[in-house]
């Protein structure tokens, strides 16, 4: 069987351990009004049978607002993980970890729902999501 032709130069992305499983409660780090989010799905994540799909820094996931205003609650939103407690090893050997697991809400068009992000944002998330990087006050 012949090998398929490459689709151009592929950028090297280091592996980040996926540590935020479906069902996890995470902090909402933007000013959309939501306080606590619950991860309900990680799209495009393939896993073994009976194993929960998990997300890591920079991943898109579907969430439900658990704590916040009534108009935001009990609806499915998209979110991007911007911080995780588990250490992320970078190519230069540095390990970066944060004090909480946090995400920002994303509209279907890819814009952030809030206009400000509280706290630092991991560099892995800002590389994948430039709209998130624009609102970040601090990128670590």
Curated annotation (Swiss-Prot):
PROSITE patterns: RIBOSOMAL_L14. One of its GO terms (cellular component) is cytosolic large ribosomal subunit. Coiled coil: none annotated. GO terms for molecular function: large ribosomal subunit rRNA binding; structural constituent of ribosome. Pfam families: Ribosomal_L14. Keywords: Ribonucleoprotein, Ribosomal protein, RNA-binding, rRNA-binding. One of its GO terms (biological process) is translation. Signal peptide: none annotated. Belongs to the universal ribosomal protein uL14 family. Binds to 23S rRNA. Forms part of two intersubunit bridges in the 70S ribosome. HAMAP family: Ribosomal_uL14. PANTHER family: 50S/60S RIBOSOMAL PROTEIN L14/L23 (PTHR11761), LARGE RIBOSOMAL SUBUNIT PROTEIN UL14 (PTHR11761:SF8). Part of the 50S ribosomal subunit. Forms a cluster with proteins L3 and L24e, part of which may contact the 16S rRNA in 2 intersubunit bridges. This is Large ribosomal subunit protein uL14. It comes from Nitrosopumilus maritimus (strain SCM1).
